[in-house]
Amino acid sequence: MVNSLTFTLVVVCLVRSCDGVAAVSSDMIDSTNNRISRNMIRRVLQETATANDDVKKLSTSTKVDSKLNQEIKTKPDQLVKAEKNSSKIGAWLKRMNVISSKRDKFFILATILLFPIAAYMVASR
């Protein structure tokens, strides 16, 4: 029973990792087969020069106005309310409810529920 459970977990991990590698490799462009024209190179260089000029202008303007250098941190209203609670676990759960997606919530709850079951199965052997 433990061997089959271990084998299943290894297979699931391999499938998930191969799926991620396949998704990353399919998004990459094969640059060896594409020809690069001179017009395209000139255009890229012009865009880079323009971007560098914009960065220089922006850096001089931020030196003049120091308020632009400060980070603006805003939090959702639900997160502020969740942080005000005295219960640490309750506050953590409310914060996770605001921040996490449904998929993340599912995996967190599944881990919390399945970990004691797996520990009992291993300990009973």
From Swiss-Prot:
Signal peptide: 1-23
GO CC, any one term: membrane
Up-regulation conditions: Expression is up-regulated during the early plant infection stages.
Name of the gene encoding the protein in the UniProt record: RXLR-C131
Regions crossing the membrane: 106-123
Family membership: Belongs to the RxLR effector family.
Disulfide bond residue pairs: none
Assigned keywords, A-Z: Glycoprotein, Host endoplasmic reticulum, Host membrane, Membrane, Secreted, Signal, Transmembrane, Transmembrane helix, Virulence
Comment text on domains: Has the canonical translocation RxLR motif, but lacks the canonical EER motif, which characterizes most oomycete effectors identified so far.
The protein's name: Secreted RxLR effector protein RXLR-C13
Annotated organism of origin: Plasmopara halstedii
Residue ranges annotated as motif RxLR-dEER: 43-73
Residues annotated as glycosylated: 85
Recorded topology in the membrane: Single-pass membrane protein
Subcellular compartments: Secreted; Host endoplasmic reticulum membrane
Functional note: Secreted effector that does not suppress pattern-triggered immunity (PTI) in plant host.
Superkingdom: Eukaryota
